[in-house]
Amino acid sequence: MSNLSPEAIKVRNALVEKGIETPMIDLVQDKDQRRQGIEQHMREVIKLIGLDLSDDSLEETPARLSKMFIDEIFSGLDYANFPKITNIENRMKVSEMVLVDDVTLTSTCEHHFVTIDGKVSVAYYPQKWVIGLSKINRVVAFFAQRPQVQERLTQQILLAFQTILETEDVAVYVKATHFCVKCRGIKDTNSYTVTSAFGGVFLDDRETRKEFLTLLKK
């Protein structure tokens, strides 16, 4: 963990302590070794599906998949990729709600390894610290870039911002379409899943929670 930022370590420890960290193992192989291993196994999987890897359209697919898994869609499993965040002292004494709405969410269902596509809204009441608005998008993306279930993802985002901002006053709302429902099984193309998580004043005060949810509808 020596190559991890202090923020990454604090967030990871908070998630582990609360029991909401993604089930992960400690990896002993470096990225290149893991890419090679995944590529080899994907060759066997693709053959078992019945595809011809000698075709020029498919021959590089195992390598593409290995790079995609390690460097892109599952890069959030590595806390070395946690966004660099600088807390800014709240010298302006901002006391009103800060809301970032409609943050793009693209994740992967850990049950079937197909897409979760949706939007995330994050709000907080600044206490000692504020952070750059783009950092909210980056933290959401970090936790999305790993196999996920939406309920846990929502809780992870909440606790991450509570830890970074050193305040309980955080709210998270997620609305997403699950392609494991859309493209297989029931094949429901219309339904979506909504999850939310509230802390501090958002949890304790009904009017504050109502204000947050009302703003999402505008």
Swiss-Prot record:
Which cellular component terms (GO) are annotated to the entry? cytoplasm
**One Pfam family of this protein, by short name?**
GTP_cyclohydroI
GO BP: one-carbon metabolic process; tetrahydrobiopterin biosynthetic process; tetrahydrofolate biosynthetic process
User: What keywords tag this UniProt record?
Assistant: GTP-binding, Hydrolase, Metal-binding, Nucleotide-binding, One-carbon metabolism, Zinc
Name the PROSITE patterns for this protein: GTP_CYCLOHYDROL_1_1, GTP_CYCLOHYDROL_1_2
Whom does it interact with, and what assembly results?
A: Homomer.
Question: What is the protein name stated in its UniProt record?
Answer: GTP cyclohydrolase 1
Native organism: Histophilus somni (strain 2336)
